[in-house]
UniProtKB/Swiss-Prot annotation:
Transmembrane segments: none annotated. Its main location: secreted. It is found in: Secreted. This is Antimicrobial peptides.
Amino acid sequence: MGKGSSGGGAWWAFLLLAGVLLAVAATAAGAEEDVATEVAAAADRDPKEDLRWCRKGCQWQYGQDTRQRKECERDCRQRHREQEQDADEEDGSGRGSCRSQCMRRHEDEPWRVQECVSQCRRRRGGGDDDVAVDACEGADRCRERCERRHRGDWQGKQRCLMECRRREQEEDVDDRCPCPCRRQCERHGDPATRQRCVEACQRRREEERRHGGGDADEEGSRGGRCERKCRRHSDWQTRQRCLQQCEQRERQEEGGRDDAGDGKDTYCADRCQSMCRQRHRGDREMQRRCARKCEREEGCPRRRDATADADEAEEDDGNDRCSQQCQHHRDPDRKQQCMRECRRHQGRSDDDDTRAGEDDS
């Protein structure tokens, strides 16, 4: 009799424990659903909630990385200003539906609503109404995976979603980005930062096309010629400098400002170089930068004589040597620091050789 009572008591204790566990699980799931509902309702009432959640997403994603977190928050503020400017145009234009679509699609990811609205409005502004609000094909996979791993932990699920989105962006960013913007944003090692750079570049190019008309096409053809010419440089910084110099020469040629034969222009450039040699003795790289800055400030036209071409070729060769020497650095900041030290050391070596030659003569 006592033995049966003991077995029955254990059975009732087991049932009671199972009921408690079910109640806890239901409470956690309900709490997560309540948080998501509260987030969606708050953001629907006040568009400024998008900005707040976007900033919170930057904090979750980058944590102690102050530089990238500030860059992410700056993009949040930029998108918020654009949405405020577009607020007056929403009535009757159909663009107001972007927000409701994004709210439904990202009700459990409030930090993505602001970016989604910006992308939707850009597509609507370009006349492409049939494009989906979110082009990421792996969005549903990420959501299902993170819900299984972090059931009941809303904040943990947000971090999981961020990591999953970042991996998805890293896999398909090269397929979705226009070539000029992708080339311009290669310097960013972090996929999320590179994607934001590409989106900002796309916005600028769309604004140029809207306001500039044919000038944007002309700029694109000029950039294509310079891109082919500067493709030989493997280092990103050297290639960008080559592109800037090439495009500047193209603009000067198109504007009819080729004044290389004018003695006054030569005197202007020579004066800058002489001043910078005195100011930065022994540092050839600083002499070049100082001379370029001085020529821009003084308005000196770029020389097209053999000396200028030789200097540019010499600088390119030096940059190629330095880029090969520093290519083992994966971190962009360390690679740039290595490049600067290499150029500075190379400039001193060239000056020492020059002084030695003068002493021998």
